[in-house]
């Protein structure tokens, strides 16, 4: 009887994690799965821990954007931006080895995270402007929209390189078939319209 109960408990835990892809310990606890039991499943080889407080099925093929999902699980208030957002939007040819995330000026930042992070701090995150949501491996991802990503590439051009910003701008204008209204609107919010104007006119 006890063995059957354990099997049912294990099946319940694995089913929850399979559904989510990457599951957080606190969500699993809320669903009735204790952290101590999750540790046991890790020791048995049934689960893996991609990061502290996160669990996935052992041997599960990671989805595209897996490391971004892990990073967003660690820094849940962060916004994926710049090179990592370009990658998710398929703009340009950048393949960053770090996950670029925007966080508040005084926000908590992890020490020795499970994935390499490049955190950009800002006093005003402008969370209501050009921020989208996706779900990867069951984790909610917040990321800058294509237009905001391009604008921020120009804002941080001294860090990432002007060539990266120009490549992304050209591809976005081509994708939008020359329509730049949203791009201009966001450029004004970030006071980048004068910087971007000559490049926009040349690329249009």
Named regions from a protein language model:
Residues 3-31, 37, 42, 50, ...:
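Nucleic-acid-binding surface
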């Amino acid at each position: 009887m006890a063995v059957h109960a354990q099997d049912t408990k294990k099946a319940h835990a694995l089913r929850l994690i399979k559904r989510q892809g990457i599951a957080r310990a606190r969500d699993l606890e809320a669903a009735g799965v204790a952290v101590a039991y999750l540790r046991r499943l890790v020791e048995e080889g049934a689960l893996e821990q991609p990061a502290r407080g996160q669990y996935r099925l052992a041997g599960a093929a990671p989805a595209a954007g897996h490391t971004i999902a892990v990073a967003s699980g660690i820094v849940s208030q962060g916004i994926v931006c710049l090179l990592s957002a370009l990658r998710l939007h398929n703009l340009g040819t950048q393949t960053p080895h770090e996950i670029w995330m925007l966080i508040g000026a005084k926000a908590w930042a992890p020490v020795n995270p499970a994935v390499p992070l490049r955190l950009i701090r800002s006093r005003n995150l402008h969370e209501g402007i050009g921020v989208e949501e996706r779900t990867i491996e069951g984790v909610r991802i917040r990321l800058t929209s294509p237009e905001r990503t391009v604008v921020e590439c120009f804002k941080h051009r001294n860090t990432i390189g002007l060539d990266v910003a120009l490549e992304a701008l050209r591809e976005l204008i081509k994708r939008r078939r020359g329509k730049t209204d949203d791009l201009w609107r966001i450029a004004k919010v970030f006071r980048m319209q004068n910087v971007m104007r000559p490049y926009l006119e040349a690329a249009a």
